[in-house]
Amino acid sequence: MVINPSLIISTLNLGILAILLGSIFFFSKSYFSNENPSLPINKAASAHLSINNKSEAIEYNSGPFAMAILKALALLSVISLLVAINTEFSDINITLSLWLNNTPTNISLNFIYDQYFLIFLSIALIVTWS
């Protein structure tokens, strides 16, 4: 089986974007609720509970884990950028309309990976990590 460099680049970039999209939900700062539960809450090493008069907030400190994820994603984006530079990569167009065809409207997602996107993604992840 021949490994195509464009396949490596598209797989790395789709993985980076999926992890970034998933991290929106897992690395949020706090969750608010107006209820006052009577059950005791166990404290984890990365979470603490603060109670105000009006609301209760459970805050999660996921800083070190989020920074490690950003470091790994920055490294992966630099690897995909170096593969693209070494193979004289031009661009890839990935269309995800076949996966979303069960809806009454036509939904089509197009990802265009060119050198500008690869440079932007690498710089953005390195700046966010630092």
Curated annotation (Swiss-Prot):
Alphabetized UniProt keyword annotations: Electron transport, Membrane, Mitochondrion, Mitochondrion inner membrane, NAD, Respiratory chain, Translocase, Transmembrane, Transmembrane helix, Transport, Ubiquinone
A Gene Ontology molecular function term of the record: NADH dehydrogenase (ubiquinone) activity
EC numbers: 7.1.1.2
Cell compartment(s), UniProt: Mitochondrion inner membrane
Regions crossing the membrane: 7-27, 65-85, 107-127
UniProt topology in membrane: Multi-pass membrane protein
A GO CC term assigned to this protein in UniProt: mitochondrial inner membrane
Swiss-Prot/TrEMBL catalytic activity: a ubiquinone + NADH + 5 H(+)(in) = a ubiquinol + NAD(+) + 4 H(+)(out)
The protein's role, per its UniProt record: Core subunit of the mitochondrial membrane respiratory chain NADH dehydrogenase (Complex I) that is believed to belong to the minimal assembly required for catalysis. Complex I functions in the transfer of electrons from NADH to the respiratory chain. The immediate electron acceptor for the enzyme is believed to be ubiquinone.
The protein, known as: NADH-ubiquinone oxidoreductase chain 5
